[in-house]
Structures are given as C-alpha cells and as structure tokens.
Design a protein with these regions (language model features):
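Bacterial N-terminal signal peptides that target proteins for export
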Residues: 1-9
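C-terminal motif of bacterial Sec signal peptides marking the signal peptidase cleavage site
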Residues: 18-20
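An aromatic- and glycine-enriched ligand-binding surface/loop that stacks and positions planar moieties
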Residues: 22-93, 195, 203-206, 221-391, ...
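Conserved, well-structured interaction surfaces
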Residues: 43-47, 51, 55-65, 88-167, ...
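Short coil/turn linking the two alpha-helices of tandem helical-hairpin repeats
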Residues: 164-166, 171, 213, 237-246, ...
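Short coil/linker segments at helix-helix boundaries
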Residues: 169-191, 241-255
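Active/binding-pocket-proximal capping segment
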Residues: 430-436, 446-474
C-alpha cells in the first residue's frame, strides 16, 4: 500500500513540477481563431500570408512600386499611365492634377502641401517584417520557406529603393516594432547604408525565388525574373544617381545593373512581342486586354468588371497630351534626329510631323487619318487634332498631340463610366534591354555587340536603322547635357520606348537633368 501511495505521489509531483517549469502545457490557444502562435504551419499558410502583401501593394498611392491603376477616389491620378505628367512628356489639362504641375514647376512646398505618393505604406513594411519573423516556424523544407521569404524581401527592397529615391535618407526598419521600440524615435538611416540593405534583399530574392510559380504568367506571384528586373532598375537608378550627383560609388551599382539585366536577357524565358507588323505591333501590344502568356510581359495587373475595375480609362484625357519636346525626340526613318535629317518635313502642316518618322510616333500620338482605326471619339464628326477652347466634343488636348498608346475604345464602349478592364504592365522585357545598354554605356565598356542585343532589338521591332557606335549623330538639341552623343541616343531610346510607363521623372532625377522641366515643352 505504501508503495502504491509513493508512486502516486511521485507521479503527481512530477506532473506539477513539469507543469510549473513549462508554461506551454498550460497555454491554450483558441481553436476557432487564427493566432500568430498557431498559424505558421504549412506552405499554404505562407502562401496565403504573402497574398496579403499583394493586396497591400495594390494601393498605388501608399505603395507606389508595382504601379497599376488605383481604383476608388484616387483613380483619377493613381495610375502608372499618369506619372509622366510629372515630367516633360505630358502637358496635363486637368485642374485636379495640380499636384503634377506643381512638382514639375518646382513649386510643391513641403510640408505645407501634402504629398500624393509614397509617404504612407509603412503598414506594408510591418506586414513584411512580421512574415519574415515567422516563416521559419512552418514544418516544411527550408527551400520552400526561403522562396516566400524571398518574395517578401523583394517587396521590402523595392519599397525602400523607392523611398530612398524620393527622400534620400530613410528610416529603415527590418523587424516588427512595438509601441516601445526605439526605432520609432531614431534618426533616418543614411541613404548609402539603406541601399546596401536594399541590395541584400534583392540579391536574396534573385537567389531564392523560383523561376516559375507554375501560373503560366498569369497576373500572379513575382518570380526570379521579376526580381532580376527590379534589381536592374534599382541598381541603374542608384548607379547613375551617384555618378551625376557625386553621391558615392557608381561603378558597383552599374555593374550590378548590367549583370542582372544580362542574366534576364540570356537565361529568362522572355522576348519582345513581335508579329512582324512594324506599323502596328508597338501600339497593339499596349492594348491587349489579357496578357496571359505574352512573351514580353514579366508582371502585370489584371482588371475585371465587377471585381477590380480599371477606372483610369475614363480619365484618359486628364493626361492632356504629349509635349512637343517628346514628339520632336522621335528619329526620322534614316536614324537621324529631326535637327539633322533631310527627311524631316517640318510641322507647318500637322500631318507632316508623322512623315518619315520612327513608326512608334504614329503608334503613340494620333494621326488625323487614324481616328477610325482607333475609334477615337467620332460621334460629332469633327476632325482632329482638337485643342482646349476649340468647339467640339471628344478629347481635347493642351498640345494637339492626342495620345493613343494605351487608349482602348473597345474597353469603354458599352460600359458604364469608371468600368474598364485594360491591364497594367508593371514589368516588361524591353526595360531590361534598355537598362543593359545604358549601364554598359555609363561604365564606358559598351560594344556594338551590346547594342545589337539590346537597343537594336527594339529598333528591329519597328524596322528602324540600327544604332552604330561608329556613327552616332550629334543632336544640337542635346549638346548642353554634358554627356556623350551615345548616351544621349540611349536615353532618347528609353524615352520613346517607355513613354507613359512611369519612368521619365525618375530618369530626369537620376541624370540630374531637372533643368529640362524649366523649358517650355508644349
């Protein structure tokens, strides 16, 4: 009997001792709720969590990195198509877009005037850091955990690169904070240090992301090729910014940009969209509603009536019109700028502007003879171009240069206002070609072979003459830019190819060419 009592007592003591030393035995989490302690178990848990990051990045005003077409109240300005209004590419006509005009004119005062883009989004960083602190809890292979961590770190690096480009020094946070965290009151992280952390995030993403998530290039998750293009973009910005602003090392950044772009070009599954129609392919590519499987598109955002609408088609006229500066940058068909080419017919007659010019001009700006082709507001029978103040309905412009790139009448006819389905291309292969050529030129190591696998691929699509290192024209319009004629021409190609895709303002910033915004361009 004593032996039985002794064993029973010992058992009770052991249970109490263990219970007293291990609080986890007493911790019980709700079975009908998701908690941080019980959530991180399977790959599906990590995939579901990272999907919330894509939901957050949809807010283009708060997180302007993977820009598409913001819906709701901000839809009239929160689109990738409208960002060129900050630059010398567009002449906005809309009073609601005064912000773009103020920025361009250098009259946007901080902090008396609120910013529209990029000062918010810190909940996005918190969500990323929470995920990174918990992915390892899942009972799945390390390589699987790493690819979701890579997805989050790609977003974090991209976010902070945008912040550094906008503000310079920036508060860099890489862990979940509480109300007592000292980082809440810390000074901003120096730009150089922050950008090293950005590069580490992007390198991790390139190394760990899968080449294919198995989605068939649906508008789904960012893959390794997307990470390479984001890295190339960020490194090109940092390299040229440092070079022209005397802000630090440029060589390393330019080498990283060229290396990332070249790897995407050599090993990625992408190529330029080309059906062999130089007079229409460029425009047609930017009007495709479903980009699934498109060979040039690396990442895109899909819109569907009744799910997520593209409101921006309804505000297309707010862009005002292309500037004369942009139109004059298109080369003639002999490969020479209008200032040097005998083929240029002048602009006394509007139609002459399009004669003997790079086919991308007529696929970007409306030729009066193409109104039927693009179904461009034909209801009142009046001709185009139309300027503000001139009688007539339809779209009116500040410049006469009506934009048809991205314009898709078929996506508006028969639909209610603010309901469209035109997608947003966020990353495309052509940018890699342009980035590679520019980085190699800035490094001073570019060869004809480099041009042939980059810039000249873009020219082949529209049957324009190749750029030749030994015969680069010296355009008198750019002799005061302080760069070589070769770099002038590579920058010109970038401006033409990526018009109205949200690059021009940042390009002018990194090149230290803000003076171009002081010149009347309409």
């Amino acid at each position: 009997m004593k032996k039985i009592l002794f064993k029973l007592g010992l058992s009770c003591f052991t249970l109490l001792a263990v219970g007293g030393c291990n609080d986890s035995l007493l911790e019980k989490f709700p079975l009908d709720q998701i908690t941080n302690e019980t959530f991180w178990n399977t790959e599906n848990d990590l995939a579901v969590y990272n999907t919330t990051l894509y939901n957050l990045v949809r807010n283009d005003v708060a997180v302007p990195i993977m820009m598409g077409h913001t819906d709701g109240f901000n839809s009239h300005f929160g689109s990738i198509w409208q960002q060129d209004e900050l630059s010398d590419n567009l002449a906005t006509r809309e009073a609601r877009h005064i912000f773009f005009q103020q920025i361009r004119a250098g009259k946007h005062n901080i902090p008396s005037n609120p910013d529209w883009f990029g000062y918010q989004g810190w909940n996005f960083i918190r969500a990323i850091n929470v995920g990174l602190a918990n992915y390892d809890k899942a009972a799945i292979p390390q390589a699987t955990k790493d690819k979701y961590a890579a997805e989050a770190r790609l977003f974090r690096g991209w976010f902070y690169a945008e912040k550094a480009a906008k503000y310079g020094d920036v508060p860099y946070v890489e862990r979940e904070l509480s109300v007592d965290s000292e980082e809440l009151y810390a000074a901003r992280t120096p730009r150089k240090e922050a950008m090293q952390k950005v590069l580490a995030d992007l390198n991790f993403a390139v190394e760990k992301l899968p080449a294919n998530w198995g989605d068939g290039n649906a508008p789904g998750r960012l893959n390794r090729w997307a990470a390479l293009l984001v890295k190339a973009r960020v490194c090109l910005y940092e390299g040229t910014f440092n070079k022209y602003h005397g802000a630090g090392d440029s060589k390393m950044w330019l080498e990283e940009a060229a290396k990332a772009a070249k790897e995407l070009m050599d090993k990625g599954p992408y190529r330029l969209y080309n059906t062999g129609k130089p007079d229409s392919d460029y425009n047609a590519y930017h009007r495709i509603l479903d980009l699934t499987g498109n060979p040039e598109v690396i990442s895109w955002r899909k819109y569907k009536t009744g799910v997520i609408n593209n409101h921006v088609q309804s505000y297309f006229s707010y862009t005002g019109g292309a500037t004369k500066s942009l139109v004059e940058d298109y080369l003639c068909t002999d490969g020479l700028p209008i200032s040097l080419s005998p083929l240029y017919k002048g602009d006394e007659k509007f139609e002459d502007v399009f004669e003997n010019r790079d086919p991308r001009l007529r696929q970007t700006v409306l030729h009066p003879a193409d109104t039927q082709k693009y179904n461009y507001h034909l209801g009142d029978g009046r001709s185009y171009p139309r300027l503000l103040g001139v009688p007539g309905g339809g779209y009116q412009t500040t410049t006469g240069y009506h934009i048809i790139k991205h314009y898709n009448a078929d996506d508006m006819i028969g639909k209610a206002f603010n309901t469209g389905e035109s997608p947003a291309i966020t990353l495309r292969f052509a940018e890699a070609l342009l980035t590679y050529a520019e980085a190699m030129a800035e490094l001073g190591t570019i060869t004809q072979a480099d041009l042939d696998i980059s810039i000249n691929k873009l020219r082949d699509r529209v049957k324009m003459p190749h750029m030749k290192i030994g015969s680069i024209p010296v355009d008198p319009r750019y002799t005061k830019d302080g760069v070589s004629p070769l770099i002038v021409e590579i920058r010109r190609e970038r401006r033409i190819e990526l018009f109205m895709e949200g690059h021009r303002y940042n390009d002018l910033k990194r090149w230290k060419q803000g003076k171009k915004l002081e010149i009347p361009t309409m």
